[in-house]
C-alpha cells in the first residue's frame, strides 16, 4: 500500500547504516552494519518515539515538534521552535557511522534555565514477552563524563550498540513504565520504555558530570552529536569509542582491592594522558601512565592501608577527562560482622514478605565465624517470636499469602543455616517438613514450582533453597533411613524442576509484571548451575549449557564495563525502592540485594567451566555488593542508585504497628503517607526498618552476606587465565624452585581452589603447609584433603 504523501517515509543512509524517518523527524526503523552483518534497531511509536526534543521548564513538560527542512541521499535536517528557542535535528554520517546532531539556539533576551532539555532517543527498550525480548536493546550503561558521554545498549542474544558523544552531556534518564494503578496512585513497573539524553539539566548532579550545562544564554547556540555503533562483543567497545569521543576510555579488570593488592588500569586514548589520583586518606598525586602500544596506556593502582575509594581522573592532551573509582576494602569477615550488628538494629520481622526477615541469614551464618552466645540468643528469640506468626507449627503451612512460595523456600534456607550454626537437628527437621509442604502444594506435573498458574521456579530460587537442604541432609542420610528417604524425595523434586527449566529454554514467568527480568534470568541460571555441580561430570551437560546460555544473555542487565568499584557487576534493577524503602518513583537500584543472585550464577559458571572470566565477574560483583556496609562508619545501607537525577518522595513519618501479635501484610504506597521530596543522584540509600515498624523489605540487603558466606568466606582462589597469567583472590602466589607457594591473605581460609593444570603447589594455611602435585582443577582443604567437586565431596 502506498502511503499518503504527508506520511511517506524518508529513506536516508550511508555506507554502514540505513534509516527510515517520519516527516516529524522520528525514526521508523534503523539498520546498522556490524562485522557480522546488519543489526536492526527497533524504535518506539507514540509518546516514546524518537529521536525527539523533550524538555521541562517553567513547571511544564514540552515536546518540541520539528519538520523536514532539507534532505539529501546521506541525511536529512529537521527544524522547529518553541518560544525563543530554535531547534534542529540532523541525521547524517560521521566516518561512515550513523550520527544524530542536535542543536538549540536561544534567540531571546533572557537566559533559559530548564530543569531538563535533550533528546528522547526512542530506541525500543520495552521488554514485554518471550521470545520478543531477545531482540530488544536494554540500556545497559549510560555514563556522563565531564567532557563527553558514552555507554551502550545490549540484547540478550548478544548484539551491542555503542552510544557516544564527543560533547559533554549533562545527564540522562530512563523512562520507566507504570506497572499498575491503585486508584489514582501509580506503582512503578518492570519495563523501560526508552531513554533520554539530557543535554542541559539543573543540579544537583553527580560530581563527575559536567556542572555548567544548566542554561542557554541569550544569543547562545549549543550543539551535540550522538553516534550509534554496532559491536559483536563488549571487549571491542572501549577501544572503538576512544577516538569517537576523542577522550580516554578506562578499562579495569579488578575494581576492588584488598589492602596491599594492586590492579592495572588500561587507558585507551589517541593522545598521551596524565592521571590525577585521590587516595582514601585524602592524599593527592599526579602520575604518568606508561605507553603500552598504539593508543594504549597502563597505570598501576596500588591499595594502601586506608580503606575507601581511590578516585582516578585521566586527562588527555586536549583536556578530555574520564574518571574511575577503585575500592579498597577491609577483609571479608569485617563486612559480615558489621552486617550482623545491623541485622539486630534493623531486625527481622514477621511479614508477608520473606525480604523482611532476610537478616536471619546473616545472623545465623555469622555465628559460624563469630561465635557469640548473647547474639545467638537474641537471634533465637527473634526466630521463636516471628516463626509462629507466619507458619503453622503443626502442618507447616504458611498462614498468609500462601501463593508466595518463596516465603516457604526462603525459610527452608534460613533453617538450614540455623542447623549449621547450632547443630540442632530439629531445625533441619522443620526445614524438611516445609520442603515437603512446598513440593506437595506448589510443584506441578511438569516439574515447575508454581503460584497458582504462574511459574515461580525462578522467584527467589526455591530450588536452590531445597538444594541447600539436600546438601545438609546428605551426612545424616548416610546412617539414617528416615533422612535418606527425605533426601531421595527432595532430590527427585529438584531434578524435575531443573529438567523443566532446561526444557523451557527461557520461556518462563516471574512474579509481578512479565519482562526479561533480572531475577528471573539470574535465578534460573544459578539454580541450573548449582544442580549441575551436584551431578557427576557425565550428567552435567544439559544443566551446565542451559545455565551458561541464560547467564550470558543476562549480561545485557549487568554492569560489566563500568570503571567504578561501587557498581561493577551490579544488575540493572529498578522497581524495588517503592517496596523496600518507601521511595517513589522508579529508579535503578544497582547493586540491589538481588544483584547477588547473578554472583552465585557466575561463581557456579566458573566452577563448571574453569573460565577465569566468570570468577573475575564474581569477585568484582561481590565486592561492590558488600560495600552496602559503609567502609567508613560500618553502617549498613540498602542499595546504590546510579540514576543521576531523580526527584523522589519518601515516607518521612514513622509507620507504627498497633498489634505485634499478627504478621504484617501488604505494601505501603509513598503518597498514602506523609512524605518528603528530595533529589537522588548516584548515591547510596540508607535502611529505614530501624525506625519504621510496618512491613518494609530493606532486610533483603542481607542476600549479599549470604552470598559472601557461600562464595568467598573461608576460601581462596588461584587460576591461570587464557593468556597464561596467574590470577589470585584472597591469597598470594609465588613460584620458587618449580613449586607454586600459595599463602591466604584473608582470615580463616580453609579451602583453596587451584585452577592451574599440571603444577606442584604448596599451600601455606595458618594451621600448616599442604603440598599437592596437581593434574586437574581441585580444592585443597587445610586438613590436606583434595576435593575435585565441592558440592559432591569428591
Question: PLM ranges: what are they?
Answer:
Residues 214-232, 788-790:
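Short Pro-Gly-centered flexible turn/kink motifs
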Residues 274-334:
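Extended acidic/polar, glycine-enriched regions
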Residues 134-215, 272-274, 281-287, 760-763, ...:
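Trp/Gly-enriched beta-strand surface patches
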Residues 329-596, 603, 607, 612-625, ...:
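Catalytic cores of extracellular degradative/oxidative enzymes
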Residues 127-131, 238-260, 322-352:
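Low-complexity, Pro/Ser/Thr- and charge-rich linker/hinge segments at domain boundaries
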Residues 108-118, 237-238, 274-277, 751-754:
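Short, hydrophobic/aromatic beta-strand segments
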Residues 1-101, 105-180, 185, 225, ...:
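Beta-strand-rich N-terminal accessory domains
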Residues 234-263, 271-272, 307, 472-485, ...:
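Terminal, non-catalytic domain-edge segments
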Amino acid at each position: 500500500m502506498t502511503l499518503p504523501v504527508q506520511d511517506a517515509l524518508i529513506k536516508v543512509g550511508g555506507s554502514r547504516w540505513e534509516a527510515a524517518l517520519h516527516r516529524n523527524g522520528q525514526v521508523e526503523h534503523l539498520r546498522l552494519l556490524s562485522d557480522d552483518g546488519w543489526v536492526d534497531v527497533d524504535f518506539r511509536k507514540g509518546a516514546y518515539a524518537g529521536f525527539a526534543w523533550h524538555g521541562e521548564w517553567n513547571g511544564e513538560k514540552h515536546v518540541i515538534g520539528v519538520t523536514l527542512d532539507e534532505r539529501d541521499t546521506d541525511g536529512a535536517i529537521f527544524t522547529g521552535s518553541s518560544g525563543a528557542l530554535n531547534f534542529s535535528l540532523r541525521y547524517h554520517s560521521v566516518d561512515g557511522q550513523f550520527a544524530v546532531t542536535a542543536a538549540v539556539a536561544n534567540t531571546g533576551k533572557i537566559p533559559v534555565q530548564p530543569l531538563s532539555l535533550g533528546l528522547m532517543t526512542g530506541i525500543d527498550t520495552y521488554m514485554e514477552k518471550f521470545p520478543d525480548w531477545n531482540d530488544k536493546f536494554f540500556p545497559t550503561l549510560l555514563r556522563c563524563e565531564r567532557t563527553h558521554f558514552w555507554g551502550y545498549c545490549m540484547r540478550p542474544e548478544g548484539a551491542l550498540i555503542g552510544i557516544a558523544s564527543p560533547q559533554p552531556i549533562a545527564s540522562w534518564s530512563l523512562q520507566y513504565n507504570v506497572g499498575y494503578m491503585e486508584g489514582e496512585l501509580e506503582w512503578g513497573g518492570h519495563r523501560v520504555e526508552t531513554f533520554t539524553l539530557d543535554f542541559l539539566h539543573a543540579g544537583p548532579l553527580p560530581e563527575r558530570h559536567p556542572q555548567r550545562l544548566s542554561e542557554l544564554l541569550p544569543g547562545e547556540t549549543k550543539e551535540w552529536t550522538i553516534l550509534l555503533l554496532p559491536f559483536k562483543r563488549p571487549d571491542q567497545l572501549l577501544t572503538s569509542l576512544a577516538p569517537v569521543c576523542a577522550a580516554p576510555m578506562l578499562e579495569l579488570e579488578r575494581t576492588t582491592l584488598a589492602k596491599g593488592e594492586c590492579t592495572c588500569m588500561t587507558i585507551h586514548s589517541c593522545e598521551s594522558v596524565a592521571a590525577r589520583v585521590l587516595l582514601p586518606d585524602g592524599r593527592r598525586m599526579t602520575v604518568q601512565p606508561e605507553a603500552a602500544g598504539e593508543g594504549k596506556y597502563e597505570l598501576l593502582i596500588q591499595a594502601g592501608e586506608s580503606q575507601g575509594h581511590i578516585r582516578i581522573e585521566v586527562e588527555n592532551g586536549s583536556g578530555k577527562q574520564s574518571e574511575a573509582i577503585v575500592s579498597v576494602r577491609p577483609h571479608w569477615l569485617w563486612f559480615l560482622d558489621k552486617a550482623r550488628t545491623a541485622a539486630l538494629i534493623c531486625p527481622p520481622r514477621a511479614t508477608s514478605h520473606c525480604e523482611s526477615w532476610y537478616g536471619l541469614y546473616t545472623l545465623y551464618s555469622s555465628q559460624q565465624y563469630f561465635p557469640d552466645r548473647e547474639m545467638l540468643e537474641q537471634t533465637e528469640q527473634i526466630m521463636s517470636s516471628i516463626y509462629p506468626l507466619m507458619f503453622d507449627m503443626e502442618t507447616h503451612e504458611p498462614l498468609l499469602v500462601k501463593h508466595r512460595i518463596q516465603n516457604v523456600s526462603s525459610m527452608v534456607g534460613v533453617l538450614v543455616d540455623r542447623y549449621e550454626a547450632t547443630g540442632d537437628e530439629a531445625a533441619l527437621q522443620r526445614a524438611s517438613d516445609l520442603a515437603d509442604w512446598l513440593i506437595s502444594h506448589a510443584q506441578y506435573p511438569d516439574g515447575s514450582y508454581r503460584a497458582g498458574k504462574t511459574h515461580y521456579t525462578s522467584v527467589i530460587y526455591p530450588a536452590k533453597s531445597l538444594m541447600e537442604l539436600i546438601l545438609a541432609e546428605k551426612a545424616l542420610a548416610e546412617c539414617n533411613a528416615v533422612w535418606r528417604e527425605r533426601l531421595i524425595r527432595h532430590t527427585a523434586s529438584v531434578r524435575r524442576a531443573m529438567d523443566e527449566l532446561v526444557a523451557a529454554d527461557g520461556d518462563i514467568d516471574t512474579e509481578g509484571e512479565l519482562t526479561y527480568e533480572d531475577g528471573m534470568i539470574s535465578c534460573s541460571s544459578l539454580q541450573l548451575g548449582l544442580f549441575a555441580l551436584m551431578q557427576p561430570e557425565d550428567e552435567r551437560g544439559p544443566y551446565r549449557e542451559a545455565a551458561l546460555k541464560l547467564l550470558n544473555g543476562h549480561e545485557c542487565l549487568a554492569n560489566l564495563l563500568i570503571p567504578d568499584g561501587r557498581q561493577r557487576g551490579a544488575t540493572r534493577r529498578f522497581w524495588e525502592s517503592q517496596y523496600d524503602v518507601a521511595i517513589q518513583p522508579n529508579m535503578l537500584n544497582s547493586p540491589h540485594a538481588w544483584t547477588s543472585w547473578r554472583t552465585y550464577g557466575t561463581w557456579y559458571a566458573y566452577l563448571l567451566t574453569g573460565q577465569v572470566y566468570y570468577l573475575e565477574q564474581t569477585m568484582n560483583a561481590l565486592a561492590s555488593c558488600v560495600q552496602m556496609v559503609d567502609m567508613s562508619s560500618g553502617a549498613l545501607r540498602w542499595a546504590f542508585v546510579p540514576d543521576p537525577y531523580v526527584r523522589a518522595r519518601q515516607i518521612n513519618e514513622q509507620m507504627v504497628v498497633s498489634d505485634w501479635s499478627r504478621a504484617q501484610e501488604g505494601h505501603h504506597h509513598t503518597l498514602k503517607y506523609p512524605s518528603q521530596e528530595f533529589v537522588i543522584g548516584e548515591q547510596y540509600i540508607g535502611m529505614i526498618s530501624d525506625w519504621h515498624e510496618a512491613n518494609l523489605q530493606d532486610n533483603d540487603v542481607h542476600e549479599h552476606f549470604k552470598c559472601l558466606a557461600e562464595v568467598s568466606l573461608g576460601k581462596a582462589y588461584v587460576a591461570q587465565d587464557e593468556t597464561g597469567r596467574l590470577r589470585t583472590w584472597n591469597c598470594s602466589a609465588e613460584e620458587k624452585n618449580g613449586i607454586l607457594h600459595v599463602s591466604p591473605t584473608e582470615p580463616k581460609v580453609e579451602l583453596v581452589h587451584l585452577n592451574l593444570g599440571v603444577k606442584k603447589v604448596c599451600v601455606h594455611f595458618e594451621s600448616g603447609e599442604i603440598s599437592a602435585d596437581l593434574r586437574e582443577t581441585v580444592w585443597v582443604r587445610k586438613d590436606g584433603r583434595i576435593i575435585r567437586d565441592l558440592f559432591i565431596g569428591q
